[in-house]
Amino acid sequence: MAEFDSKVPVSGMNNHVFEACHHVVKALRASDNNLDANLRKLLSDLEMHLSTFGIADTKVEDAGFSEIKKRFKEAVKRIRSWETNQSTMFEAGLSEADQFFQALYDVQTVLVGFKALPMKTNQMEKDVYNQATVALDIAMLRLEKELCDVLHQHKRHVQPDYLAVSSRRKDIVYDESFVSLDDEVIVEASSHEDDEQISDFYNSDLVDPIVLPHIKAIANAMFACEYDQPFCEAFIGVQREALEEYMVTLEMERFSCVDVLRMDWEDLNGAMRKWTKVVKIITQVYLASEKQLCDQILGDFESISTACFIEISKDAILSLLNFGEAVVLRSCKPEMLERFLSMYEVSAEILVDVDNLFPDETGSSLRIAFHNLSKKLADHTTTTFLKFKDAIASDESTRPFHGGGIHHLTRYVMNYLKLLPEYTDSLNSLLQNIHVDDSIPEKTGEDVLPSTFSPMARHLRSIVTTLESSLERKAQLYADEALKSIFLMNNFRYMVQKVKGSELRRLFGDEWIRKHIASYQCNVTNYERSTWSSILALLRDNNDSVRTLRERCRLFSLAFDDVYKNQTRWSVPDSELRDDLHISTSVKVVQSYRGFLGRNAVRIGEKHIRYTCEDIENMLLDLFECLPSPRSLRSSRKR
């Protein structure tokens, strides 16, 4: 590939051109002290070539003029031949490109010589100058077109196989009240679990490397001819358009601040999730590759390379920044916590990348804007986290939760907390200077992990303590003491299971787990006592009369019927806990009933015994099944 250097070719100069060049030499000699090194070199080359053709003085052979004239015309002709040619020189081959650059260099050399003259006084000089100027303009327009065509035709896209924005799983959408985020969807809830891994500053070729020498030759030629601005405008235009197309490929829409503030939660949730992926791809991959391309082409013009890169990337960067700025204007609602955490974490992660992309003063505004956005996201995320606890405390109920099952608030809070360990480093950083009362005093021991007393761990335990207080208040809405115990048992058991079966365990600690296991087991005991103590008392022997025994048997059956009708509507969703309750109750009730009948069945009389031991045992299995209405009572065996 031809490059612009100090070689001066003998190009199609006619007799007038030789005479003009002779004037150039004289003018340059007269002002030799004012010439830079390049122009002095040009002077020497001109003298050498003119001498070669016998024109060091005013006499020149006719044969020399004829040859020079022919070559001058060929140079102009070659430049004009590409004026309407729609193909690219790169496609035409290396030889064609070299010949074009050689012709351009010849014309530019003549123009440099003419510009050194104080003025062009005769028509001959004007004609030659005009011919060279027109040829140069044609060449520059053609190179500008060549640049755009080659960039378009040899553009490469960042491979989507490792940068796909759309996840293979669906987004989790949090309801704005505490009624969503059930166990069935929590598996899909974390934004971290399947995030595509993006290597730090993975440079992908945005343009086929095979054309880079050609593009660089175009840049050198246009810069040498003082057409640097048209080159930069064309280059910036094509690359900015390519970046915009890539943003569309990533499905990152441009939103105004008003758009973001008016979005419903489902749309905003999706847009925030997409932003966290796109901003990493753009800063860590695409713009890193774009900066590399600018340096490869314009590395010899460092300040211009930087300016071009900033102009190419500015619109896309501002679009991403504006979205982030608009998001932090939204209210700090609890359901937005995980999204804010994701945006903050990504914004903090890419700051090093942004600093590397825009290290100079010319890019300082973009660099500072990213740092400011990260700070705003940090503040907004912290406020949202603290308001999450307040929202739990203020969640009041006026009616008891049906069946004493696991309250929506408990599911929401615990499943939400399960997401947070993935943000441990970020939350520890955000919460380190915010004091909170903790239910677990700090102590040391082999079974105590340091993470148990991290800022995040203390705050999470405090949130659960607030949840427990809310559940205690909700339990007071039940008139039935047994159902109150079932409600607390269910919800405390649920909390323990969520902590034991997730990363929350290393944050809450085994002591917290033991304490809360004891708490729900205490509620099991309270349930059994409030439900069965008075009923089982009917089965005790006091040397009663037959009439009294029959009355006790009748009252037991009535009390058992009442328990059956009520507690088959109650809910114990945890199958293991439900089985344990069935076994525990069966041991106490069936054993007592069997003993009572064994001692007194003959005296009571079969017709006064409504249920057998097998009936009681089977009916107990229906308890806590949350039936819409009680099944028909087991067949009574009235005799």
Curated annotation (Swiss-Prot):
Cited SUPFAM superfamilies: Cullin repeat-like
Carries keyword Electron transport? no
Which GO molecular function annotation, any one, does this entry have?
A: phosphatidylinositol-4,5-bisphosphate binding
Would you kindly state one Gene Ontology biological process term found in this protein's UniProt entry? positive regulation of extracellular exosome assembly
Location(s), subcellular = Secreted, Extracellular exosome; Secreted; Cell membrane; Cytoplasm
Q: Which family does it belong to?
A: Belongs to the EXO70 family.
What's an example GO cellular component term for this entry? exocyst
Q: From the UniProt record, report the name of the gene that encodes this protein.
A: EXO70E2
What name goes with this protein? Exocyst complex component EXO70E2
Q: Keywords of this protein's UniProt record, alphabetized?
A: Cell membrane, Cytoplasm, Exocytosis, Membrane, Protein transport, Secreted, Transport
Summary of the function given for this chain in its UniProt record: Influences the subcellular localization patterns of other exocyst complex proteins (e.g. SEC5A, SEC15A, SEC15B and EXO84B) leading to their recruitment to exocyst, well-defined large punctate structures throughout the cytosol. Essential component for the formation and the recruitment of exocyst subunits to the exocyst-positive organelle (EXPO), a secreted double membrane structure also called extracellular exosome, that acts as a sequester for cytosolic proteins to release them into the apoplast.
Q: How does it assemble?
A: Component of the exocyst complex and of the exocyst-positive organelle (EXPO). Interacts with SEC6, SEC10A and SEC10B.
Q: What happens when the gene is disrupted?
A: Unability to recruit a number of exocyst subunits to the exocyst-positive organelle (EXPO).
Q: Which InterPro entries match?
A: Cullin_repeat-like_dom_sf (IPR016159), Exo70 (IPR004140), Exo70_C (IPR046364)
- Give the matching Pfam families: Exo70_C, Exo70_N
The free-text tissue note of the record is: Expressed in roots, in the root-hair zone, both in root hair and nonhair cells.
